[in-house]
From Swiss-Prot:
EC number, as in UniProt: 3.4.23.-, 2.7.7.49
Residue ranges of every copy of the Reverse transcriptase domain listed in the record: 147-331
Protein name from the UniProt record: Retrovirus-related Pol polyprotein from transposon opus
Ranges of residues in domain Integrase catalytic: 752-910
Keyword match Transferase: yes
Catalytic reaction(s) noted: DNA(n) + a 2'-deoxyribonucleoside 5'-triphosphate = DNA(n+1) + diphosphate
Organism: Drosophila melanogaster
Keywords: Endonuclease, Hydrolase, Nuclease, Nucleotidyltransferase, Protease, RNA-directed DNA polymerase, Transferase, Transposable element
The keyword Hydrolase is annotated on this UniProt entry: yes
Top-level taxon in the UniProt lineage: Eukaryota
PANTHER family: PROTEIN CBG26694, PROTEIN NYNRIN-LIKE
Gene Ontology molecular function, alphabetical: endonuclease activity; nucleic acid binding; peptidase activity; RNA-directed DNA polymerase activity
Any GO BP annotation: DNA integration
Pfam families listed in its UniProt record: Integrase_H2C2, RT_RNaseH, RVT_1
Length: 1003
């Protein structure tokens, strides 16, 4: 408190004899004196910012402990009680260091240090940008300030980021200001994200419901108050024309800067957040329900900030207000509204001329969409412009892509601006009262309004709406209405989860019964389970009463002039919207148009203005065609004609002149809403003779040899006959030219057949030639035990193959069956004679069907995975050594089929009992393994055969078309014709002696 005033020539010893007035403050302990702007003018003194001193006369300098520019007048609103200013001054006087100039030698006391974790150890260097010559002085000035404040220091770091100069908001006198910024774009791309959560703005605002008084505190140079971790300081390096520097404090522009600062401020105010204040990065709001409590709450927050040596910008702070600006909103005791300054900036924006400007406008308005009733509807013409060709445009290029608003989009642009300017105040939620959630859905959007009863008046808390995607547009009406409820509950979860009663109002009465136990719709059942998380009471509200939510979901479609044009009076439109149920405005009620000719419908109504009398004919059996005269008379004649000719069970085709479409639509909507009707304007020739049909199909097919679907569409332009698709498919399926030269678009997928299961190890052996690191190996795997072995092979010559095969069969004790692919070396007489001498059956996989020999192919895949990992872990080992190690690792690992190690099964290492026990144990083990193999095979085949068919059977002499897989050119035949000699269920043997898998045959 000021006790008295002193006036005198206090600076006379320094050469200035001006009378100076000082006010005595006994509680001022941080300084000997504070000089204001008027005193500086009287002294004609100069503040030397660089040297932090006051120059009274040339040669006389006074060191300054602090310097600041503070506008004291707006700290309090005028309507506060008497004495409030004195209480505030006293409170601020308790914490003088909080309001000292930025970074005046103090260190923030917090456990949080700013670090930059990157996914690479390589220094990130970006070339400097050339900035304007006339800005060099400004850059040097700002560099000097940062050096003086201890924010940066000279650097010799290998890292580098460029700087740029951007304009700031001008001073009140119009003087331009600039800010030096560092572009950390390249550093940010390699920075590991800090996942610390930033508070949800809507949840924060919703929690201020019972408060009456507010104080907002703005932290001075927020990020610069946090020290950088010493090891990460070099990463912040940047260069200018006069040197290179690095940040000692957290700079602006780093990817993780907001999360780091939020962690720091949460650490400092942890005990008070949610009780007396909320924090969003460097913005703090202190709240209370009454005047006296507010001083206590404010003192607690200031004490915590003072203890941590954080500094507050007094100019941007507001104390003890009933209405404050916070996070772009105006927070009052009555509720929340949009910030008029932000709204004014939006209202003054010109129409966008580029994609970037359009997205910027939509982003700004979307921030306030909770205030805009029916935002999805109003903004839809603009959001449509960001899709299609403009959807994948990069942000850096969006400013170069021009865009033009049509009349509808321009109207949407102006409507959004005008609605924002007149938006109402949204109420705070009261969590002790029931919530009202009113929802509605249309064919293109869903919407809802959350409200509560306030003294007999239903006050809105939030408006929400969104457009439906393509999948959701195909939902049934009841599913769309349920989706509106589910989406609204999820979107408003911060308000509704754990709340008391939630009354959900819908204008779709069947929905109130769909939540019962007799509902068999799986999708609705799943959604019902999600609704049960909330304490909901579903209430039917007729469309007349459900105006707001109904409007949120109404985005009127373009009806192509099929209905009467609405008057350009928005009041009339809203009046009709408020007094009619949403279903009556639904475009899905209009009779759809189709491209097919009227001939395809079994009941055809052809209206003709030139016809004088009615005629009924039957172009085909089961088809009826009504030729009806149409005159410009009353609606009764047209209604009577439709009543007598329409059939309620089947789809009716109608051909009517476009001039009478509107009349026809209105009659159908009023009298025939449940009938299936399609409108078309096409009539083609009927073809009934079998020979004529075959000739037409043959002529069209030979023209381009297209498929049945294309031929049908082509013929429908001129002709129609019943069962067109099946007739065309049957006739074209026998075309030899198509079978030989066309691709097989739907290849055969015969069911996978079970393969023989061995009873013991070494009964069935799979072999293949395997190349690795310029060496050949004979790969062998026992089908029973899954034990594998690689034998070195000198070449694929039959003599070398026979030598290696002898070694392998000796190791595996001559199996009963040997499975291999079509390796030529195995077909030579010497190898075949050797196998016959050992009584070994050789089974060949069909040509180019290596998957039939899948046991060894699957082993190769697993072996290569192990080999590559070993090669990385043991770089000094030779490839041959790695091969042996990899095979050993495979054999000593548990196999997923047998649940045992292949080596244990193959060598029976697990048996360590007496002879009799060994035999019984061995027998039981083999039976268990066989059962596992059989089970895995059956289960695998069942899963893979879901989309496959039973193999087609062929008799001796049947023609089959075999794929020419060896052909490398595209102009030759894709298939060749062969005759079947023997059908082996999954393969066929042709008269040429070759075996083909049935998946290689044309359907």
């Amino acid at each position: 408190m000021i006790t008295h005033r002193l006036v005198g020539k206090f600076f006379k010893p320094l050469g200035n004899d001006s009378d100076i007035t000082f006010f005595v403050l006994p509680n001022l302990h941080s300084f000997d004196g504070i000089i204001g702007d008027d005193t500086l003018k009287d002294l004609k003194a100069i503040v030397d910012r660089k040297n932090n001193c006051l120059i009274i006369t040339p040669g006389i300098k006074i060191p300054l402990l602090a310097r600041a520019s503070i506008n004291v007048n707006p700290l309090l609103a005028a309507e506060h009680p008497d004495g409030t200013q004195e209480i505030l001054n006293s409170l601020l006087g308790e914490f003088p260091r909080i309001f000292e100039p930025p970074l005046s030698g103090m260190s923030v006391e917090t456990a949080v240090k700013a670090e930059i974790r990157t996914n690479t150890q390589d220094p990130i260097y970006a070339k400097s940008y050339p900035y304007p010559v006339n800005m060099r002085g400004e850059v040097e000035r700002q560099i000097d300030e940062l050096l003086q404040d201890g924010i940066i220091r000279p650097s010799n770091s290998p890292y580098n980021s460029p700087i740029w100069i951007v304009p700031k908001k001008p001073k009140p006198n119009g003087e331009k200001q600039y800010r030096m910024v560092v572009d950390f774009k390249r550093l940010n791309t390699v920075t590991i994200p800090d996942t610390y959560p930033i508070p949800d703005i809507n949840a924060t605002l919703a929690s201020l419901g019972n408060a009456k008084y507010f104080t907002t505190l703005d932290l001075t140079s927020g990020f610069h108050q946090i020290h950088m971790k010493e090891s990460d300081i070099p990463k912040t390096a940047f260069s200018t024309l006069n040197g290179k520097y690095e940040f000692l404090r957290l700079p602006f522009g780093l990817k993780n800067a907001p999360a780091i600062f939020q962690r720091m401020i949460d650490d400092i105010l942890r005990e008070h957040i949610g009780k007396v204040c909320y924090v969003y990065i460097d913005d703090i709001i202190v709240f209370s329900e009454d005047y006296d409590t507010h001083w206590k709450n404010l003192r607690l927050v200031l004490a915590s900030l003072s203890k941590a040596n954080l500094q507050v910008n007094l100019e941007k702070s507001h104390f003890l207000d009933t209405q404050v600006e916070f996070l772009g909103y105006i927070v009052t005791a009555d509720g929340i509204k949009a910030d008029p300054k932000k709204v004014r900036a939006i209202s003054e924006m010109p129409p966008p001329t580029s994609v970037k400007e359009l997205k910027r406008f939509l982003g700004m308005t979307s921030y306030y969409r909770k205030f805009i009733q029916d935002y999805a509807k109003v903004a839809k013409p603009l959001t449509n412009l960001t899709r299609g060709l403009y959807a994948n445009i990069k942000s850096s290029q969006s400013s170069k892509v021009p865009i033009t608003l049509d009349e509808t989009a321009l109207q949407s642009f102006n409507d959004l601006k005008s609605i924002l300017c007149s938006s109402e105040i949204l109420a705070f939620p009261c969590f002790t009262k029931p919530f009202h959630l009113t929802t509605d859905a249309s064919n293109w959007a869903i919407g809802a309004v959350l409200s509560q009863d306030d003294q007999g008046r239903d006050r809105p808390i939030a408006y929400i709406s969104r457009s439906l995607n393509k999948t959701e547009e195909n939902y049934a009406t009841i599913e769309k209405e349920m989706l509106a409820i589910i989406w609204s509950l999820d979107n408003l979860r911060a308000y509704l989860y754990g709340a008391g009663t939630i009354k959900v109002y819908t204008d779709h009465q069947p929905l109130t019964f769909a939540l019962g136990n007799r509902n068999f719709n799986a999708k609705l059942k799943r959604w019902k389970a999600r609704i049960e998380e909330y304490n909901c009471e579903l209430i039917y509200k007729p469309g007349k009463s459900n105006v707001v939510a109904d409007a949120l979901s109404r985005i009127p479609p373009q009806l192509n002039q099929l209905s009467t044009d609405l008057d350009a009076n928005p009041e009339d439109d809203m009046q009709s919207l408020a007094t009619a149920h949403s279903a009556l405005h639904d475009s899905s009620r209009l009779i759809p148009h189709v491209e097919s000719p009227i001939n395809v419908f079994k009941n055809q109504l052809i209206f003709d203005t030139t016809r004088s009398k009615y005629l009924c004919e039957h172009p085909f059996p089961g088809y009826t065609r009504h030729l009806i005269p149409l005159k410009d008379g009353s609606l009764a004649d047209l209604t009577n004609s439709l009543q007598s000719c329409l059939r309620p069970v089947i789809i009716n085709g109608v051909k009517i002149p476009e001039a009478h479409l509107q009349r026809f639509q209105s009659i159908c909507l009023a009298n025939f809403l449940l009938y299936k009707i399609r409108i078309t304007q096409r009539l083609v020739a009927d073809v009934s003779g079998a020979e004529e049909i075959c000739e037409i199909i043959e002529k069209e097919h030979r023209r381009a040899h297209r498929g049945p679907t294309e031929i049908r569409l082509q013929l429908l332009e001129k002709y129609y006959f019943p069962r067109m698709s099946s007739t065309i498919r049957l006739q074209t399926s026998s075309c030899q030219c198509c079978k030989l030269y066309k691709y097989e678009r739907h290849p055969n997928k015969p069911n996978l057949q079970p393969t023989p299961i061995p009873n013991y190890p070494c009964e069935i052996l799979h072999i293949d030639i395997f190349a690795l690191e310029k060496r050949l190996y004979l790969s062998c795997i026992d089908k029973f035990s899954k034990f594998a072995k690689l034998f070195h092979l000198q070449s694929k010559a039959s003599v070398h193959l026979r030598e290696t095969l002898v070694e392998a069969l000796h190791y595996f004790t001559a199996p009963k069956v040997l499975v291999s692919d079509n390796e030529r070396g195995l077909l030579c007489p010497t190898v075949l004679n050797y196998l016959r001498s050992l009584d070994i059956d050789l089974y060949y996989a069909p040509t180019q069907k290596s998957e039939v020999n899948g046991q060894v192919e699957r082993f190769h895949s697993t072996f290569l995975e192990i080999y590559r990992c070993l090669k990385d872990e043991l770089p000094t080992f030779k490839p041959v050594e790695l091969v042996h190690i990899a095979v050993d690792r495979y054999n000593t690992s548990v196999h997923s089929v047998t649940n045992r190690k292949p080596a244990d099964v193959f060598f029976d290492r697990s048996s360590r009992v007496n002879y009799q026990g060994l035999t019984d144990f061995r027998r039981q083990t083999l039976e268990d393994i066989k059962g596992l193999i059989e089970y895995k095979q059956i289960r695998g085949n069942m899963a893979r055969n879901k989309n496959r068919d039973e193999p087609k059977s062929y008799g001796p002499g049947d023609e089959v078309f075999v794929a020419n897989k060896q052909i490398k050119t595209k102009e030759k035949a894709r298939f060749r014709c062969e005759k079947v000699q023997e059908d082996n269920k999954i393969t066929v043997k042709t008269r040429s002696g070759k075996i083909f898998h049935k998946s290689d045959l044309r359907n």
